[in-house]
UniProtKB/Swiss-Prot annotation:
This is LPP20 lipoprotein. It comes from the Bacteria. It is a lipid-anchor. A lipid is attached at residue 22 (N-palmitoyl cysteine). The lineage of its organism: Bacteria, Pseudomonadati, Campylobacterota, Epsilonproteobacteria, Campylobacterales. Could play a role in the pathogenesis of H.pylori by serving as an inflammatory mediator. Keywords: Cell outer membrane, Lipoprotein, Membrane, Palmitate, Signal. It comes from Helicobacter pylori (strain J99 / ATCC 700824) (Campylobacter pylori J99).
Length: 175
């Protein structure tokens, strides 16, 4: 009898927890942070929140490979936040460029074929891409900055000629 009471009591507690846990209204996908972000980017240029592939088609940015980032302004030090955002944007640019070059290199017909007959790039190719991109990243420059209410947005770019130079050093066809 005691075991039955314990089971019923235990099941009741579990059921109550499930009911309480599920009683919250479903989230709409719009949180305070999303609202705050929309407010912070209200009136910002297209490159701040727009698709970078579309931004790259603007005449102003057509000759560069782009990266962007943001940083919260701390202690009203916009310069520090700009430097932080620029460093993040360069890191994003490097990661995107490495990924693009690896994908392009995989598509090159001159690459090695693995045991299953698929083209693949070797670890040395990946390492070489990383080294070349890191070496040329110093040539990237800040193209634009937008200072919002509480954060700084930065757009950086690397000239296509430098990207072509990296492609050439990898033995790839120019795009």
């Amino acid at each position: 009898m005691k075991n039955q009471v314990k089971k019923i009591l235990g099941m009741s507690v579990v059921a109550a927890m499930v009911i309480v846990g599920c009683s919250h209204a479903p989230k709409s996908g719009i949180s305070k942070s999303n609202k705050a972000y929309k407010e912070a980017t209200k009136g910002a240029p297209d490159w701040v929140v727009g698709d970078l592939e579309k931004v790259a088609k603007y005449e102003k940015y057509s000759g560069v490979f782009l990266g962007r980032a943001e940083d919260l302004i701390t202690n009203n030090d916009v310069d520090y936040s700009t430097n932080q955002a620029t460093a993040k944007a360069r890191a994003n640019l490097a990661a995107n460029l490495k990924s693009t070059l690896q994908k392009d290199l995989e598509n090159e017909k001159t690459r090695t074929v693995d045991a299953s007959g698929k083209r693949s790039i070797s670890g040395t190719d990946t390492e070489k891409i990383s080294q070349l991109v890191d070496k040329e990243l110093i040539a990237s420059k800040m193209l634009a900055r937008y200072v919002g209410k509480d954060r700084v947005f930065v757009l950086v770019g690397l000239d296509k000629q430098i990207v072509d130079k990296v492609r050439e050093e990898l033995g790839m066809v120019k795009k």
